[in-house]
């Protein structure tokens, strides 16, 4: 699907979308033919584990995790994935350096603005961007993140280091971005990502999710959107909304 997505992107850019030959299944059949005939190598299949369908009420949880894509020895793309657990609607933001607490809070708030509401709870791991320390199960948030959670009146669930049931969907999303977005594109700088990422996200949120077998955008619009809490003002409200 990553290869077909790039083809879609190119045909859309050129204004020739109607001339795009075949569909995803056509391309998939052709790739299988090339693999079976030995013209290209078949990649080993990595089955995804720990992803559950509608395991929380709509509007309840947003899962957050970070990813990194290496372009060269000195160049890296850092991205943050924000996933609504119920609908599997995905938001992704990227930049050319590691996220700090303020930048992460800005990305979270921008995802709220894009969705038109905020969930009741954020699910994170013990990343230093969010968590300053943990002692005997007591989590001490970074000052910036503590202020943001208070400002947005939002609960926090910090996953244990080995908690695949809770982290599975968002870890799968990080892997999906790396495999489906980055692997099929020649990315040389952050501008390449900013140029292609919004359109890619729009298309992916309107396709059937492999775990839920439903379309994230449709589930969000028809069910989850009405369960989201209203937006609140934020100190990040006027921050530049870049990818």
Regions found by a protein language model. Name each.
Residues 138-156:
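Two-metal-ion acidic nuclease core segments, chiefly of the RNase H-like superfamily
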Residues 25, 29-91, 99-107, 150, ...:
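Mobile-element integrase/transposase regions
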């Amino acid at each position: 699907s990553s290869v077909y997505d790039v083809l879609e992107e190119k045909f859309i850019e050129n204004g020739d979308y109607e001339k795009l030959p075949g569909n995803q299944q056509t391309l998939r059949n052709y790739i299988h033919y090339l693999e079976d005939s030995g013209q290209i190598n078949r990649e080993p299949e990595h089955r995804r584990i720990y992803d559950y369908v509608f395991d929380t009420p709509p509007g309840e949880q947003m899962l957050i995790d970070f990813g990194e894509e290496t372009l060269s020895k000195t160049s890296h793309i850092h991205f943050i994935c924000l996933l609504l657990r119920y609908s599997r609607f995905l938001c992704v933001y990227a930049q050319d350096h590691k996220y700090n607490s303020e930048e992460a809070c800005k990305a979270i708030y921008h995802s709220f603005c894009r969705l038109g509401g905020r969930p009741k709870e954020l699910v994170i791991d013990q990343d230093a961007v969010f968590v300053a320390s943990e002692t005997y199960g007591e989590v001490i948030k970074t000052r910036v993140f503590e202020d943001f959670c208070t400002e947005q009146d939002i609960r926090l669930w910090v996953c244990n280091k080995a908690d695949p049931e809770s982290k599975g969907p968002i870890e799968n999303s990080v892997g999906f971005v790396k495999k489906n977005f980055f692997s099929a594109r020649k990315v040389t700088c952050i501008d390449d990502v900013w140029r292609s990422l919004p359109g890619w996200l729009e298309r992916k949120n309107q396709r059937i999710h492999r775990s839920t077998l439903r379309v994230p955008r449709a589930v969000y619009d028809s069910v989850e959107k009405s369960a989201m809490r209203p937006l609140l003002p934020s100190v990040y409200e006027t921050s530049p909304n870049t990818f």
